[in-house]
Each structure stands twice: as C-alpha cells, then as structure tokens.
Amino acid sequence: MEEGTGEYTKRVVVHALEDILHQELRVLDKGFVRVVDYMGSDESVVQAARVSYGRGTKRTSQDAALIGYLMRHAHTSPFEMCEIKLHVKLPIFVARQWVRHRTASINEYSARYSVLDREFYIPDEKQIAEQSTNNAQGRGTPLPADAAKRIMELFRRNSELMYEDYEALLEQGLARELARMNLTINCYTQWYWKVNLHNLLRFLALRSGAGAQYEIREYASRILEIVRLWVPMVHAAFVEYHLESSTISRSALVVVRKMLQGEKVSMEESGLGRREWGELMSVLYPDGEPE
C-alpha cells in the first residue's frame, strides 16, 4: 500500500472522524479548523485505564461507565493516550490567547519567511459591543446598529491601510521580519496544533465558557463538535462532569446544606464574597432567584 491511500491499516479508525478528515470546518468570517490526523478512540482510553491488551469489555455501557468514572475523578493519563492534529486558520489576536495553553505542539505560518495574505477578521454587527460593566476582560451590551457599522468600517479601513503599508515596505526591499511589525492583529495566521485529549479537554473547558472571548469560543465550539465525532463517550462524560456541571467551595456547600434543611441564608450570613454568592445563586437558580 502507498502511504496516505487509506486503503489498509491496523490502527484504531473512527469512521465518523474519517468522514471529515481534511475538510475545512468554517469558523468566523474567514477562519477554519481542519482535522489532519488523530490517534486513538474511546477504546484507547478504556484500554489504558485497564492496562490490558484488547478492546476492553464487550458492553459499551460498561466502557461508558468507566470513562465517566475517570472523568468524574479527574484521572488524566488514560485521556493522554489519544492525540489529534489540527490545521487552524485564525486571527492573530485569537492565536495569542490560544497559546496560553502551553501543553501542545505548534508550528505556525512564519511572516519572517513568507508574506501574510490580505485577510482580516472583521466582527459582525452584533459582536460590536461596549465594555462590560462587570467583567474587565469582556464585552457588554451591543452598540446601536449605526454605531456598529461605523466601527466595522473603521476596522476595515485601518486594516487595509496597514496592509498597503506592509506591501509598500516589502516592495522597498525591507526585510519581511520588519515589514510585518505594522500589521494589525486581526490579520489571519495559520498553524498546525497537535495536542493530547486530556489537554484538549482542558482547553475546551476554559475556552468554551461564557467568560471566554466570543472569537475563541467559536473555535472551541467547532473543536467540541470534532471531539464528539472522535470520542463520543469521552465527549458525553466531559459535558456531564465538566462543561455543564459546577464546582463549589466548602463554604458554598455549607450554604446549600442549610438551604436543603429549610433555612434562609443571606449573602451577609453566608461568609461568601459578592461574586461567589452570585455564582452560587446562578447555579442554584438559573432562571433567577425566587421571591
């Protein structure tokens, strides 16, 4: 068999992931995520946990229960047996947030060796928002449509102007590593990102949450879809025990126990700070506190 034909293999193959292999899954206005390669499956996690040769149990429900146990009790090494390599096209400012997750292998398009494409991320109208009043890192209420359109045009104009200067500097013979300095951080870059499943789930837990910036959340959402196709049992356990669950402090647990016993507990009596109290109430009463 010639390498790369995909006609024969003895390794674990996940057909749902094979169906989207090398396809560009669109993100934002011009970005994408593309699965380049992968290793392992749900079976690999189960096999590693049992430290045995073979395919685990014959009952899928038992494998799912074991994966749930591993996830619930924060085991790590069984999930590290699976790896995935992604080709990602993303705005530079998103890439700078992404690389805060250091437990992965990255090789990025180099503007020292090559010329960056004339492609910029421009947020759509509904994402043009004022500074949040309760989150120093986030955005708040969307701006009126006319103001948003003016800002979008400003982004476009500045991006085009800086790119024209970039091209002019290159034409003058300036080194590429210097000419790139004037580019805006909404320019698109590309990289290959290889990560094991444990660290990927950590990335998704942090970057798919409401506190993450919208743009990187969109990438996390797309990758979460890939994880669902790749390791459906792990995905289900991750959603159950991490993504849609909540962890509370010892003091918050005391408050919950008092409430279950019928006591009324105020924020002042709870010993919790205002922010933690608010977080606890949003978990207990997602539709708003009762009167």
Swiss-Prot record:
Cofactor annotation remark: Binds 4 FAD per tetramer. Each FAD binding site is formed by three monomers.
Chain location of the short sequence motif ThyX motif per the record: 100-110
Cofactor(s) listed in the protein's UniProt record: FAD
Catalytic activity, as annotated: dUMP + (6R)-5,10-methylene-5,6,7,8-tetrahydrofolate + NADPH + H(+) = dTMP + (6S)-5,6,7,8-tetrahydrofolate + NADP(+)
Database matches in CDD domains: ThyX
GO-annotated biological processes: dTMP biosynthetic process; dTTP biosynthetic process; methylation
Superkingdom, taxonomy of origin: Bacteria
MF GO annotations: flavin adenine dinucleotide binding; NADPH binding; thymidylate synthase (FAD) activity; thymidylate synthase activity
Domain ThyX as annotated: residue spans: 31-241
Annotated pathway: Pyrimidine metabolism; dTTP biosynthesis
UniProt-annotated binding residues for FAD: 77, 100-102, 108, 196-198
Keywords carried by this UniProt record: FAD, Flavoprotein, Methyltransferase, NADP, Nucleotide biosynthesis, Transferase
EC class of the enzyme, as a word: transferase
Active-site annotation: 207 (involved in ionization of n3 of dump, leading to its activation)
EC number: 2.1.1.148
Residue positions binding dUMP: 97-100, 108-112, 180, 207
Subunit field text: Homotetramer.
UniProt function note: Catalyzes the reductive methylation of 2'-deoxyuridine-5'-monophosphate (dUMP) to 2'-deoxythymidine-5'-monophosphate (dTMP) while utilizing 5,10-methylenetetrahydrofolate (mTHF) as the methyl donor, and NADPH and FADH(2) as the reductant.
NCBIfam families in the record: thyX
Entry's family note: Belongs to the thymidylate synthase ThyX family.
The protein, known as: Flavin-dependent thymidylate synthase
Source organism: Anaplasma marginale (strain St. Maries)
Gene: thyX
